[in-house]
Amino acid sequence: MRGTTSNGAAPSGTGVAVVIAVKRLADAKTRLAPIFAPHDRETVVLAMLVDTVAAAAAVASVTVVTPDPAAAEAARALGAQVLDDPTPAGHPDPLNNALRAAEAAVRATVPNVVALQGDLPALQAQELSEAIAAARTRPRSFVGDRHGTGTSALFAFGVPLDPRFGPDSAERHRRSGAVELTGSWPGLRYDIDTPDDLLAARRLGVGTQTARAVGAER
């Protein structure tokens, strides 16, 4: 998915694969249920994924691991690779298992991996590029979310990703040895779980698909 910079230099995403795990849309973002009917919520979740993948287009590859046909179709339409989520029903750690599967799929061709949340509708391509450049200075690092408790992106350069997403993932990644990156990348930190998160991201400025989906459903 990569290109070149305006001066002809290789972009910071060269040699980097982004992996994004997406659960079934019907099961995603249930904390948005107070403001969206089920079908509308799925539409918004899919729009956020599309805006996130579009913002990551400058990296060497983007792989979306998902069991959801609509998410897979949308990712392919943007030029992303799609991996059918191999995680069995009832797995105790489905998100991290899906990310490890995606990591294994891309490691043969790309040495460096970024696990990115798929709900970053305010993400700007330049923010991700700057974060990747900062991450290159250490083997493993992460960007925390705006609340300081979650993780928006986990970077692994030449080492295993070792994802530990879930409750208090920022602390879990920190304890596992990942270095926290402190750059000013607001769009990279605004992942969406609650109505307040979505409102904050809209104030910051969301991508076209999310803006259209949210506007249509309000």
Swiss-Prot record:
InterPro entries: CofC, Nucleotide-diphossugar_trans. GO terms for molecular function: GTP binding; phospholactate guanylyltransferase activity. It catalyses: phosphoenolpyruvate + GTP + H(+) = enolpyruvoyl-2-diphospho-5'-guanosine + diphosphate. Signal peptide: none annotated. It is an enzyme of class 2 (transferase). The keyword Transmembrane does not apply. Its EC number is 2.7.7.105. Gene3D superfamilies: Spore Coat Polysaccharide Biosynthesis Protein SpsA, Chain A. It comes from the Bacteria. Phosphoenolpyruvate binds at T151, G166, S169. GO terms for biological process: F420-0 metabolic process. Coiled coil: none annotated. Pathway: Cofactor biosynthesis; coenzyme F420 biosynthesis. Guanylyltransferase that catalyzes the activation of phosphoenolpyruvate (PEP) as enolpyruvoyl-2-diphospho-5'-guanosine, via the condensation of PEP with GTP. It is involved in the biosynthesis of coenzyme F420, a hydride carrier cofactor. Belongs to the CofC family. This is Phosphoenolpyruvate guanylyltransferase. The gene is fbiD.
